[in-house]
Amino acid sequence: MISKAIIKKVSIAPRKARLVVDLIRGKEIKVAKAILMFTPKSASSIVLKLLNSAEANLAQNINLKSNDFYISEVYVNEG
């Protein structure tokens, strides 16, 4: 099952956000959250909120534990 979360109107440069997003691509949710909590970049808090939203969407829809989730695809586009 795939969960999707989108955030719009964020005032941060895509180049800076891509540095953070590249750190968590392909990781499990638990590991990605730990990485984002200890990454000293301004985009890490934004990506963490987005990750929590995607996890909540998926957990609510199919009632699975968060240990089963991983990040298959994440990207940053320019506005």
From Swiss-Prot:
Extract the InterPro entries matched here: Ribosomal_uL22 (IPR001063), Ribosomal_uL22_bac/org-type (IPR047867), Ribosomal_uL22_sf (IPR036394)
Instruction: Name the source's superkingdom.
Output: Bacteria
One GO cellular component term of this record is:
cytosolic large ribosomal subunit
A GO term, aspect molecular function: rRNA binding
An example Gene Ontology biological process: translation
- SUPFAM superfamilies according to UniProt: Ribosomal protein L22
Q: Which UniProt keywords apply?
A: Ribonucleoprotein, Ribosomal protein, RNA-binding, rRNA-binding
Quaternary structure annotation from Swiss-Prot or TrEMBL: Part of the 50S ribosomal subunit.
Please state which protein family the record places this protein in.
Belongs to the universal ribosomal protein uL22 family.
The role this protein plays is:
This protein binds specifically to 23S rRNA; its binding is stimulated by other ribosomal proteins, e.g. L4, L17, and L20. It is important during the early stages of 50S assembly. It makes multiple contacts with different domains of the 23S rRNA in the assembled 50S subunit and ribosome. The globular domain of the protein is located near the polypeptide exit tunnel on the outside of the subunit, while an extended beta-hairpin is found that lines the wall of the exit tunnel in the center of the 70S ribosome.
Name of protein: Large ribosomal subunit protein uL22
Output the lineage of the source organism. Answer: Bacteria, Bacillati, Mycoplasmatota, Mollicutes, Acholeplasmatales
Gene transcribed to yield this protein: rplV
